[in-house]
């Protein structure tokens, strides 16, 4: 970097975007208003399962301000389709999975509480809401299907599925795994449940749709993590219009966590209706709608069997999973419990034989799809709970049990038994650092001191690995993916040397305006204040796949790096011409093009100006201008890893679990901005702690969501956390230019098993060996009470 500039790779630069957000200058979808806009309100089902006999909207149509009311019949008459699944794994018998249609408005049947029945469009939201109360609907109520354990073969939900099973998938060698388990010296079995949670992004979903009669095109402002995918699917597969006729803008977005990747009925209905009414239409979810309509996460039941040899080395692992996918499929709902879950079952461990069978189950509940981590947290939770449980069964320290089963650092690249090949890793280094940070050796003294105060103290570990930067596209396609998983970037240098980067990723809390600018600063030697990052507008950015799966830096950042390399190479040719030197003699460093071994030089700004004022320019070799495009399709996943350790105290009188200490050491490869990385780790831990201790989406036997507001759905607050100790080790990714791996989901992946393992450890003197999430005060108190009662018998 030039002297005085310290804003490149590795610098903890303050986020450029924060001033806008902290001063109220953010522009979210609900801030957008169009002249003459109407407001949409969706009437939703209040029963979980029923056929629709009749919908009468006649009285509602007479209400003040009502412009139109549409039902599923209107949508069907126009031939508008519903959302589609983006990745379809093959069943173990070779057949295709079941993909029942997802109507935008229920056409003949409702399948969960919150299912869309009709949309009322009026001059104001209050008028639309009031008119909806005048709609009458005649339903034939059917038995709901809520319990995952009894859903298969229960009351039929879709005509296309007589058994309520979307797919029956497998991965691994069943015969080899059976043989390994049969010959094992010890068998450990555990049923592990991953509870259902609700994403709860700070900003609810919203949409503003507008039709332009002049050029017969649509504009949709929406809360999307992936505007190009929204445009592609909505235009080509749902509305059957040319993709170029739909302009999608995702402005500032207040969090996503996966739930804003997908296309929901509301955005599509508003877009369809705006042409019919020739007026803009606005819809913003309230928080109750978010609970009832946004895709939920997790909800797996796993039966785990692990085999050990005489030295307590793992010889085989079998996992049978039931995955609740809810009433309809969405973008990643089928891949989350299959390829994003089953392929991670080796974890950090050398496991010669692995087999998993996953059944995706339909229930009369809200759709379940990818939520921060997307399959990786589910795999890590079942594996790390089982590792802790097995260590206790064989009488080993949990840390040492993990250590003896780690893949050695000299074994890379390492081919797992479940398809993935890890390029690089060192799992002992973060384990050792985390143990040091938490003072693991001094824990028993702290446990004894807590006991003197009448508290139970426990410590729990989680050593995880995740797969990020999903790719390559050819492999994804062969496995049922319906999109490419590359990323794109355009780097445009202005005549004065400032730079605009147009990226196919999307930033909704990750800090791309800063980290991407740091890559530019590092490569070109310019201040980050001279770099503008553009994203979220399909008319401005190149086609890209958005942000999810910790892919933005590993894939999108590498695309930017490659485009910058092209800019530099063109700049060298221009500089060589101006300096009358050979191309091979040109060097570029710290924002200057120099001729090797001489004092001849041109600044980056001078070369930029020459590209646009090409008086002294190599016209025979180059076109004027300085703008380059790159698409990057990775050769492999990236594999972040690490160890998180939680320490808790439990009050036996109340069952309250207090998180008293946390230490983690992660390997994310090279860090672009350590401060932003730490913030991402903190956020992930908070969400994982929420799931482990507090959060749970609970349905009653009638399919009513009992936790449909913050009165009943508990989330963590700042005072629930100690000061989090965060550190890193580095093994750089071997196959991208930046050596980065991704960091956004690690905390949410590692934290739930660490915390539950700590709770179980705290209660282990009572004989407690397992605890399901969330470890609520009531559940913990009952475990203590039951153990004490049993001991007294």
Task: Label the predicted regions.
Residues 1-164, 187-190, 266, 276, ...:
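Flexible, low-hydrophobicity surface segments
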Residues 19-20, 133-144, 225-227, 232, ...:
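Extended active-site and interfacial segments that coordinate phosphate-rich ligands
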Residues 72-73, 240-245, 275-281, 310, ...:
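C-terminal catalytic domains of large/alpha subunits in multi-subunit enzymes
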Residues 79-85, 131-134, 200, 222, ...:
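Short acidic, glycine/serine/threonine-rich loops at helix termini
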Residues 88, 155-238, 406-498, 706-720, ...:
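Helix-loop-helix junctions that connect adjacent transmembrane helices in secondary transporters/permeases
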Residues 108-110, 242-250, 275-286, 290:
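Conserved catalytic cysteine-centered active-site region
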Residues 252, 256-278, 282-284, 512-520:
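Thiamine diphosphate
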